[in-house]
Amino acid sequence: MNIFEAPSAWEIEDLRSTNDWCFVIDESDGNLLRDSIKSLFDQDRDLFSYSPNEFDFGSSWEIIKRALLEAHHRKGLSIVRGLPREDLSQDEFRLLSWAIGLKAGVARPQGLASQYISADQDTGTDYRAANGRGYSSNAELDFHVDVADLTILTCYNKAKSGGQSMISSGVTAHNYMIRERPDLAEIAYQHFYFSRQQEQAPDEKPVYSLPLFEVESGNLFCNWNRNRVKSAQNIEGVPELSKLQKETMDFLDEILTRPELMYTMYLEPGDMQIINNYRMFHSRTGYLDYENDLKKRCLYRLWLSPPDSIKLPESWKDFYRSIEPSMVRGGIIGKSYDKRCANFDKTHSKFLSMKIVTS
């Protein structure tokens, strides 16, 4: 086990001392993008039918590209401000979010319904249930990763109160664990069982196993989701967590929430957050929403497989379905993945010169 020195091994002061991870789209570029979305929006048109070349991003795409690069290959997160919001309906803003995803990579399905874009919005689900998911609940979430190289969140409406985004570097947490509790770091390099929250595809088991930390080709990969580990304990055949495993989990969460390590932010309407899911752990506080449906908290979430991805550890193959670089990978295939989904994956991967799993 080694300490990793990298831009992604940041602490709070590192983020506060520089703004190289923060990007702004100016008003003129935002207006151009708004007009492009409005001209292309059709309530009855399937999102899969849009091509990246249809959208006019102007010079704003260079800004978004830099933000993607920062999140993917440097600090592990970035924020873009200035997406057009005021003159777009919720559905038009959804199309804008989708358009960004089309240019940035191949979107991946996110759940039981095999949905390729999700509204991060409270629909009354129970986060702690065996099939619970955080994005459809207003509960406070555990620190976790998503099942894709990158997560993009775009903010249309913020909550009445709460809903604060929390991000901690998994790389930094790894380093702290080695320094302070090397005995627990050794446990973190061993496999833990995670539940698929009853969203497994027909060819998948209800659980998968992964270490919390693993090294491949000189890169550190981080994985964590307490809620899924706890859910897995109720699934037949999953071994009971050992005392040391429980202590490792608790110590990891304690590190992640240290004030000097946990970065917090509120996403404002028109903000976009980009997170690297094998470097960063993210969470969110609980929130109180508005009664008015038009004002309710709404963020759009995309899971992306980018064309410049790197090789993953061998053990991640069950988790991502492929570990090879520049391969379409990740996502929760779910139970509604059909020919329409497969055709989108095939067509869009070809557009981006990416490879796709064929078996």
Predicted segments with their positions:
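A short alpha->loop->secondary-structure connector
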Residues: S97-A107
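"Short basic amphipathic alpha-helical interaction patches in structured regions
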Residues: D91-W98, I167-S169
